[in-house]
């Protein structure tokens, strides 16, 4: 029998599908990536073609093995991590979607959300699902599809249609329609799942008129869900044994499995999650209560804060403002000046996320004087990412009563040393950057590997988690608080900018 030397993580993201092969030392052997089309039918609407998600993801799996010259019988297991909340409804019989995938960023269900608020459901939804009422989550997207595709609700009642987030869709395709499952982390992002009883919430299903028959079975994040054949019939059968939504996978990949440990992912937006152990902490400060993975993939809880504009604000400097040619240049120009010369950039281009949740805020630059140049604005834009992270951390510490001692970081922007140092300065906390940057894929690989005994336990993984660089605060508390007070003043003035009917 061939030795099982590798784990494959499938990382299905918002703009691309990736496959990553890792060995027993958690080193990356090979990566394959394919982008796919973003569909914008109307302003504020975002869709993907589910068949293209499947085509790109399945081809990266074949490609990554070929690239590394690994045969499929050397693979111990496959783990899946995915863009969360994105919603797919398909026919059970044919496996064909009845509508495009409605993506997490899509705002088309804003009106449905307003109705839920008017019906006084905010408190119920926050208490039972851990979420705020927002188009971001899957529930209203499923309702929208059932409302707009003729006859679909009746078909769903008859058991002819299935709903799934992206993880569920991929497993359904990989097992030729034999397995219809999701995991607790993905279920906790639907606004249909009761995070205390760990079951679909009957009241939410009734309110949104979603038939229970179409929902997947919900399982732990680390167990064998089914097998997939690589190389068609008669090919190698490989267990699929790990699932987690991308941010929860990153939390696990950073080994934040103890209460009070937190990570921040700096991507297009920022996502900070703090593990709160076995207790679900209800946020009084605009954060989400969500499900995370415990040491063996069991249910833990986490607080989550999402910042909409992080890396995206650097892209704005490059693409719209033409102040830089490449995102990497931002660090160079930011360090050409001593400070921002009193300037604050509030990148509320699509409103503000946690802890403000103000869809009517808009981007602004404050504190302009005659001496301000492009470098000051570039520096202030980078600093805004760190300030927004502090906003979320303050809310987390207030909710949980836990004082953070170190923040683990990952994502594209962590390569920026200026930003990481400023982050440490403004938080007054150590910032730890890991050696392996692919922590989302790492989390999915860990969950899959633990389920099949490829790794025995977390202690074995702890040895592999190397911190590449630690940033420590380099400014005084008075200076830190003075700068942060300026940020708070700027945010206040950017809020409620856009007119809206009360």
Swiss-Prot record:
Gene Ontology MF terms: ATP binding; glycerol kinase activity; metal ion binding
Gene3D superfamilies per UniProt: 3.30.420.40
UniProt cross-references to SUPFAM superfamilies, sorted A to Z: Actin-like ATPase domain
UniProt binding sites for ATP: 14-16, 268, 311, 315, 412
Pathway linked to the protein: Polyol metabolism; glycerol degradation via glycerol kinase pathway; sn-glycerol 3-phosphate from glycerol: step 1/1
Pfam families linked: FGGY_C, FGGY_N
Residues given in the record as glycerol binding sites: 84-85, 136, 246-247
Record entry for activity regulation: Activity of this regulatory enzyme is affected by several metabolites. Allosterically and non-competitively inhibited by fructose 1,6-bisphosphate (FBP) and unphosphorylated phosphocarrier protein EIIA-Glc (III-Glc), an integral component of the bacterial phosphotransferase (PTS) system.
Any coiled-coil regions, as ranges: none
A single GO BP: glycerol-3-phosphate metabolic process
Chain sites annotated for binding sn-glycerol 3-phosphate: 14, 84-85, 136, 246
Residues bound to ADP: 14, 18, 268, 311, 412, 416
Gene Ontology CC annotations of this record: cytosol
Role played: Key enzyme in the regulation of glycerol uptake and metabolism. Catalyzes the phosphorylation of glycerol to yield sn-glycerol 3-phosphate.
HAMAP family referenced in this protein's UniProt entry, alphabetically: Glycerol_kin (MF_00186)
Family (UniProt): Belongs to the FGGY kinase family.
Name under which the protein is recorded: Glycerol kinase
Organism per entry: Shigella dysenteriae serotype 1 (strain Sd197)
Lineage: Bacteria, Pseudomonadati, Pseudomonadota, Gammaproteobacteria, Enterobacterales
């Amino acid at each position: 029998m061939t030795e099982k030397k590798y784990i494959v993580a499938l990382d299905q993201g918002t703009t691309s599908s990736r496959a990553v092969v890792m060995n027993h030392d958690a080193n990356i052997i090979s990566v394959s990536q394919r982008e796919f089309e973003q569909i914008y039918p109307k302003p504020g609407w975002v869709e993907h073609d589910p068949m293209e998600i499947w085509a790109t993801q399945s081809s990266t799996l074949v490609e990554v093995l070929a690239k590394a010259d690994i045969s499929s019988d050397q693979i111990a297991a496959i783990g899946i991590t995915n863009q969360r909340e994105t919603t797919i409804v398909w026919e059970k019989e044919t496996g064909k979607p009845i509508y495009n995938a409605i993506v997490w960023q899509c705002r088309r269900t804003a009106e449905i959300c307003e109705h839920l608020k008017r019906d006084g459901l905010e408190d119920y939804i926050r208490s039972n699902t851990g979420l705020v009422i927002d188009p971001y989550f899957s529930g209203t997207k499923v309702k929208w599809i059932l409302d707009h595709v003729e006859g679909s609700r009746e078909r769903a009642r008859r058991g002819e249609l299935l709903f799934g987030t992206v993880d569920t869709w991929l497993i359904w395709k990989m097992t030729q329609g034999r397995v219809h499952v999701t995991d607790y982390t993905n279920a906790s992002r639907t606004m249909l799942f009761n995070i205390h009883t760990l079951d679909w919430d009957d009241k939410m299903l009734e309110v949104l008129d979603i038939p229970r028959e179409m929902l997947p079975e919900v399982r732990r994040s680390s167990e064998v869900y089914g097998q997939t054949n690589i190389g068609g019939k008669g090919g190698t059968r490989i267990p699929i044994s790990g699932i987690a939504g991308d941010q929860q996978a990153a939390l696990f990949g950073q080994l934040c499995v103890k209460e009070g440990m937190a990570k921040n992912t700096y991507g297009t937006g920022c996502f900070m999650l703090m593990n709160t152990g076995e207790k679900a902490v209800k946020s009084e400060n605009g954060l989400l209560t969500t499900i995370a993975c415990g040491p063996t993939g069991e249910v833990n809880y986490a607080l989550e804060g999402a910042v909409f504009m992080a890396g995206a604000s650097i892209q704005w400097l490059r693409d719209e403002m033409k102040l830089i040619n490449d995102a990497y240049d931002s660090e160079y120009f930011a360090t050409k000046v001593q400070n921002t010369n009193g300037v604050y950039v509030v990148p509320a281009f699509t409103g503000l996320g946690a802890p403000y949740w103000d869809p009517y805020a808009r981007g602004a630059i404050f504190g302009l004087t005659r001496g301000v140049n492009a470098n000051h604005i570039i520096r202030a834009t980078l600093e805004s990412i760190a300030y927004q992270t502090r906003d979320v951390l303050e809310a987390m510490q207030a909710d949980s009563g836990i004082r953070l001692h170190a923040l683990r970081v990952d994502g594209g922007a962590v390569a920026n040393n200026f930003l990481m140092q400023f982050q440490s300065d403004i938080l007054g906390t150590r910032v730890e950057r890991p050696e392996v940057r692919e922590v989302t894929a790492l989390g999915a690989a860990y969950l899959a590997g633990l389920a099949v005994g490829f790794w025995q336990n977390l202690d074995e993984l702890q040895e592999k988690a190397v911190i590449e660089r630690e940033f420590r605060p380099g400014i005084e508390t008075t200076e830190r608080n003075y700068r942060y007070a300026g940020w708070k003043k700027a945010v206040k003035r950017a809020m409620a900018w856009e007119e809206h009917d009360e």
